[in-house]
Amino acid sequence: MSSKEVKTALKSARDAIRNKEYKEALKHCKTVLKQEKNNYNAWVFIGVAAAELEQPDQAQSAYKKAAELEPDQLLAWQGLANLYEKYNHINAKDDLPGVYQKLLDLYESVDKQKWCDVCKKLVDLYYQEKKHLEVARTWHKLIKTRQEQGAENEELHQLWRKLTQFLAESTEDQNNETQQLLFTAFENALGLSDKIPSEDHQVLYRHFIQSLSKFPHESARLKKACEGMINIYPTVQYPLEVLCLHLIESGNLTDEGQQYCCRLVEMDSKSGPGLIGLGIKALQDKKYEDAVRNLTEGLKESPVCTSGWYHLAEAQVKMHRPKEAVLSCSQALKIVDNLGASGNSLYQRNLCLHLKAEALIKLSDYDSSEEAIRTLDQISDADNIPGLLVLKSLAYRNKGSFDEAAKIMEDLLSSYPDLAEVHALEALIHFTKKDYLQAEKCFQRALEKDTEVAEYHYQLGLTYWFMGEETRKDKTKALTHFLKAARLDTYMGKVFCYLGHYYRDVVGDKNRARGCYRKAFELDDTDAESGAAAVDLSVELEDMEMALAILTTVTQKASAGTAKWAWLRRGLYYLKAGQHSQAVADLQAALRADPKDFNCWESLGEAYLSRGGYTTALKSFTKASELNPESIYSVFKVAAIQQILGKYKEAVAQYQMIIKKKEDYVPALKGLGECHLMMAKAALVDYLDGKAVDYIEKALEYFTCALQHRADVSCLWKLAGDACTCLYAVAPSKVNVHVLGVLLGQKEGKQVLKKNELLHLGGRCYGRALKLMSTSNTWCDLGINYYRQAQHLAETGSNMNDLKELLEKSLHCLKKAVRLDSNNHLYWNALGVVACYSGIGNYALAQHCFIKSIQSEQINAVAWTNLGVLYLTNENIEQAHEAFKMAQSLDPSYLMCWIGQALIAEAVGSYDTMDLFRHTTELNMHTEGALGYAYWVCTTLQDKSNRETELYQYNILQMNAIPAAQVILNKYVERIQNYAPAFTMLGYLNEHLQLKKEAANAYQRAILLLQTAEDQDTYNVAIRNYGRLLCSTGEYDKAIQAFKSTPLEVLEDIIGFALALFMKGLYKESSKAYERALSIVESEQDKAHILTALAITEYKQGKTDVAKTLLFKCSILKEPTTESLQALCALGLAMQDATLSKAALNELLKHIKHKDSNYQRCLLTSAIYALQGRSVAVQKQISKAVHSNPGDPALWSLLSRVVAQYAQRNAKGGVVAGNVAHILDSNHGKKALLYTAVNQLAMGSSSAEDEKNTALKTIQKAALLSPGDPAIWAGLMAACHADDKLALVNNTQPKRIDLYLALLSAVSASIKDEKFFENYNQSLEKWSLSQAVTGLIDTGRISEAETLCTKNLKSNPDQPAVILLLRQVQCKPLLESQKPLPDAVLEELQKTVMSNSTSVPAWQWLAHVYQSQGMMRAAEMCYRKSLQLASQRGSWSGKLSSLLRLALLALKVCMANISNDHWPSLVQEATTEALKLCFCPLAVLLQALLQFKRKMGARETRRLLERVVYQPGYPKSIASTARWYLLRHLYAKDDYELIDVLVNNAKTHGDTRALELNQRLSSQ
């Protein structure tokens, strides 16, 4: 291609680019490049086209190629710059600065405007890459260029300002050249500003100063800039603040700097730098309080001023506030660490560390000393600075490391012998070791070298103070140096504290001492010792206002858990002032500070006690005693509070603890006596008179001990008198009190006092109390004591002259009490009571006294009641009623007024009498109320005609009257033991409660009281009652003797005598007595009863016909009794004459009207049905009765019993019936538990498999409730046997195999102990023997079983059942050997069974023997025989067991593959009959197994087996067997889906046998 063609192609390329045909352009360029590879324009055009086609890499390569070819040509560089600007190319950041630089070079001489534009772009690029120096230099060059071009000042100002903006943002990273260019830029920008002053100019100036302040070495320039701005803007704070802060931080705060600070504070009173500057000036002037105040306020505004924090710490150290100083130093150090490590900051850091260490050492505690050592270790070159070494030694001394401290001290002494601090250090170490003489010398040497150090004077004064009494009192010693220290350092609080000690303890000048303590506390408000001393002295000087002011100031400032001393003292102040709530709050605050201060706890207890908080006070004193076990006071207060709260036993225990420590502590002895006295009073209220006597004896013992130590204390004599008088109500026979001879005027020993002697001693004690202190209440107590003595004389019938004298004395004493205190209603009341006593009878005086008592105390139920009694005594019933009513309205719970109303009701014959007496017993126990209520209960019970009335139902039954009356009457006779009717009523009530022995005892007590009485009839009645009760308790001989002691003329006596003879077994004599009774009987009913009793007596003698004749005589009377008809019915049952029994029962049903007879009627009816063999009717009859009377537990119990005996198939219902009986009535429930257990056993395996083992648990419970019942022990034996059988089925070890013999012994022992019917005993013993032998056989204890049978046969050889048992035992080993039995043996066994031919189990056992010998037909015949017997007897369980055994026998034959249609049909027949009897899981299983044997793979086989496996209600063992066969069936059918279902079912039920089979079958 020619050059012309090249030009044409380039032109075409240029045109294509203009027309945006970039691909065409590329083609033309490539055409050119084929001819001329180094054509500049072609490469440039390629770059342009490629850039437009968004092919930056190709464009870059083209431009670079062009630039290489022609480096001084602009086009390629411009294109490259545009390309980099357009695309963020990978090499753009690296290459673009070079491109811009090349363009600058090319534009410099060609186009200044474009040069400037490129220059700005280059600066922006450098700025982005944080190349500050390049930015500064390039922009500087731009400004210079513009200056050369003659640019305006405004433009130049903006350019300089722009440069400040570029560089001001990151001054920390700049080098010196950049910084200088920045400052030059600021200066030029400020100089070129056209508006001065202006807002814009001010901001620029601020930025300039801000930048300068970041560079410490530019301090001169900073100062100049600040001063320049101050001159232009005199009202602006900023330059002043920066300048002040700069001067403060640099440590060059000159007078001029002070002026700046003052000027700044004038402008803004809260200016941080200004206040800090003023604070530093105050510190220099030793105005420490001003310094701390200004520095603290300044640092709030300027918290990052290191020097400010340092100087604040310095001022705080000077003012002896080391804790605050440590915090200030720590703050300064934190700021220094944030600023980084420069030369100045390192210096500041060392200063702060030094000061912090000094402050920490002043704190003196171990942790602070440890921290001080760590702080000193941080100071550079600390080991070479003596001052720091001194501090380290002091730190070691404070923490107890004396060896380290001494070592440093010795090194310092050798290196710096002229340094005062070193000698002072040596002195302190000697002082610590209590070597005060050496310490004195060293401090003196230190003071010789520096006399103006307050600390040295203080320490020397302290040395003298502790050196001894002499130096302490010597004014030239301790006092002089303390005063010098106080003069040199007026902020040293501790020196003022010791000056206070000096003036208080040595001089005795309390006012001056208080001034010193106040000064010390003002200087250091954490000095608890000074504060406490100031407060204590103020209290001593009776300046409570000042004391309270100090305490309030401290407590207001105190944080939680501090200032204990102040809280404690203020709490005690409030406690003394009676402000209890404030005292509690303050003492609680004191305890927060020190929870282990027992004094605080005691004070808090006192505060709680003062405001009536006994429980909280008790806790406080308890805590105090725990913290200080030696404190008697705390324990005493605990005891005293427990005594107040009525916890007398606990109080006694606490008092005893005190007495053990200090035997003569009278308050504790008094407390012990009071507690026993109060317990005696409580016992008397509960009518526990014996306890009360014991408590009084103890109380007198303690009061006597107290009087031995303090016989001059009146209250102790009064308390002893109270104790003696307290037992006035107790029966004289019970009062035998042992009193220490000291109280009776003897030197030693004890004396037993009777009631009259004790009361007399009480009067003497009151007399001694009056001699010591004559008080109205003691006169009153003495008067009451004389009254009680008079009462006792009247009760015992003693000398009437003495009685009169005592009553006169009583009146005299009570009048004296009234004269001393005429407003006390109790004294008037007591005087009234004595005045109306029968020995005086001054009713007018009594009425006057009661009225005066009411006038003295309006709410006075006692006086109104006494007034009512007075009116009632004088037969003024209406007035008495009104008085009692008034008393009731005033105090409805006051017992006596209710008794009064009851007596009025009784007098007028009101129906409310019984209710009122009952209400008195509900309120509290009182002899009059108790006797009245018991009388009305007995009276109501004796009236047999009222049983169906609502009044009887409510008063007796609903109100539970009999036990309530019995309880209160027991209390009555406990106290009043000479009133025979009370014992008679008590015996009567005990009879009703079936407490026969207690009733007999009560009747016997009545007899003893009536022996000397003239009323012989009453005595005979008591004997009759006693004899009747002896007979019912089984003491027949005593009963016979009792009745013989009566004339035996009254019908009741003769009948009682006859009954006693009958119960003793003297039937002939009993018959004679009944015949004698017949001769004198009058009423038809009584005659019927006697004839019935006579008939029973004749029956007992074997005269059945005579008995029947007598009972027939009863039945033909006009009014035959139900008892005689019941006896006739029972006689028919005994004779097995159903016709007679039925006729008697029909007659009986005509006369029975009461619901109470339901049980007897039902029992007799069901017994007749049982005699007739109608088992179903037996259950139906009782079920019908239960439905009619669902609340009768006896019927439920009977139902449970007959179900177990006659209807075992309904055993589940029998269990329910037994449980209901047990719930309704625990008495019937005892026997019902046995029936329940028997029914549970009858339910079979479904019950036995229960995890709770229901039957066994039930029978165990029954054994606990009735251990004397032999049937229960027999039942327990059966339950254990069932449990062992279940264990064998489940392949587990039986648990109770050793119990059979023990339980058999328990049955025999129970039969001997209790009297049961003979045939019942024999049956139970035989059954128990059979069960025990069976259990022994099953558990393999053959020899024991054989021994048991042999032993039983020796005592009675004629026992076919036992012989059968023996044969079963003997055959067991033979059968287990699986050898054929000889014919002779089989014949012997057959004979034995034939001798027990009516026994179903015997035939079943013989069948089992035949089966073991392969004699299947013979076995079948035996089973059929057992089935026949069971059917004849109606034994459901016998029939079921026989059918199942028969079916099992036939199935075994079938399984043996014996081809005979007889056996399969026998299985089907027997199981079908069993299923007719009841749902029988075993029968269903046997049918399924028969089907399995017949057709293993048939669908019917699976259906039958699945029914057993999956349907509920099948026992585990049966379901497991079915599961085993079903698994075999399914594997035979290869039905793996159903196999998986069955395996999951086996896993759910824990059937390991089935799972093992599955593993075996699946592996084959």
From Swiss-Prot:
Gene3D superfamilies: Tetratricopeptide repeat domain
This protein's name: Superkiller complex protein 3
Assembly description: Component of the SKI complex which consists of SKIC2, SKIC3 and SKIC8. Interacts with PAF1.
Location(s), subcellular: Cytoplasm; Nucleus
Record function comment: Component of the SKI complex, a multiprotein complex that assists the RNA-degrading exosome during the mRNA decay and quality-control pathways. The SKI complex catalyzes mRNA extraction from 80S ribosomal complexes in the 3'-5' direction and channels mRNA to the cytosolic exosome for degradation. SKI-mediated extraction of mRNA from stalled ribosomes allow binding of the Pelota-HBS1L complex and subsequent ribosome disassembly by ABCE1 for ribosome recycling. In the nucleus, the SKI complex associates with transcriptionally active genes in a manner dependent on PAF1 complex (PAF1C).
Main location: cytoplasm
Annotated InterPro entries: Ski3/TTC37, TPR-like_helical_dom_sf, TPR_rpt
Designated gene of the protein: SKIC3
Modified residues (N-acetylserine): S2
GO biological process, any: nuclear-transcribed mRNA catabolic process, 3'-5' exonucleolytic nonsense-mediated decay
Keywords: Acetylation, Cytoplasm, Nucleus, Repeat, TPR repeat
Disease tied to this protein: Trichohepatoenteric syndrome 1: A syndrome characterized by intrauterine growth retardation, severe diarrhea in infancy requiring total parenteral nutrition, facial dysmorphism, immunodeficiency, and hair abnormalities, mostly trichorrhexis nodosa. Hepatic involvement contributes to the poor prognosis of affected patients.
UniProt-listed SMART domains: TPR
Superkingdom of source: Eukaryota
Pfam families linked to this entry: TPR_16 (PF13432), TPR_19 (PF14559), TPR_8 (PF13181)
Intervals holding TPR repeats: 6-39, 40-73, 272-305, 307-339, 386-419, 420-453, 455-492, 493-527, 564-597, 598-631, 633-665, 679-713, 790-824, 826-860, 861-894, 980-1013, 1020-1054, 1056-1084, 1326-1359, 1400-1433
